[in-house]
UniProtKB/Swiss-Prot annotation:
InterPro entries per UniProt: 5_LipOase_AP (IPR001446), FLAP/GST2/LTC4S_CS (IPR018295), MAPEG (IPR050997), MAPEG-like_dom_sf (IPR023352), Membr-assoc_MAPEG (IPR001129)
GO annotation, cellular component aspect: endoplasmic reticulum membrane; nuclear envelope; nuclear membrane
Stated family: Belongs to the MAPEG family.
Top-level division of the source organism's lineage: Eukaryota
Lumenal compartment residues: 1-8, 78-80, 129-153
Name by which UniProt lists this protein: Arachidonate 5-lipoxygenase-activating protein
Intramembrane residue ranges: 108-115
Keyword Transmembrane helix: yes
Gene (name only): ALOX5AP
Organism placement in taxonomy: Eukaryota, Metazoa, Chordata, Craniata, Vertebrata
Length: 153
């Protein structure tokens, strides 16, 4: 891979690797809670503390593929820097959601809502990139330069 290609995706790759580490952290919390309450075997049911950790992890795992698709689509089709920043914000919000879910369930609600908004922002970036492609193909007008100018200032 040449240096220019790597430069166009390096931030997205970093955010993806950070998200993998975060998933490992969540899985470790589930494993630790399971061993604390169930001994050496892993079971999906148990005390309320385990149920909360397991459910929070499962909710994060369910949204993970959507996050990855939106992150990479927005970064490749529109602009890498704001997509990577939004991805980092999403990971921060997901951490707050996970920790909030372990306490009172109302503490996880702001993280959930803000996470949905970040996914929507990444979706809008992806749509802008697709729209730009068709504007170039049909009208010869490239709005990506305007987008990159705004995002780099």
């Amino acid at each position: 891979m040449d240096q220019e290609t790597v430069g166009n995706i390096v931030l997205l790759a970093i955010v993806t690797l950070i998200s993998v580490v975060q998933n490992g952290f969540f899985a470790h919390k589930v494993e630790h809670e399971s061993k604390t309450h169930n001994g050496r075997s892993f079971q999906r049911t148990g005390p309320l503390a385990f149920e909360r950790v397991y459910t929070a992890n499962q909710n994060c795992v369910d949204a993970y593929p959507t996050f990855l698709v939106m992150l990479w689509s927005a970064g490749l089709l529109c602009s890498q820097v704001p997509a990577a920043f939004a991805g980092l914000m999403y990971l921060f919000v997901r951490q707050k959601y996970f920790v909030g879910y372990l306490g009172e369930r109302t503490q996880s609600t702001p993280g959930y809502i803000f996470g949905k908004r970040i996914i929507l922002f990444l979706f809008a970036m992806s749509l802008a990139g697709i729209l730009n492609y068709f504007l170039i193909a049909f009208f010869g007008s490239d709005f990506e330069n305007y987008i990159k100018t705004v995002t780099t200032t």
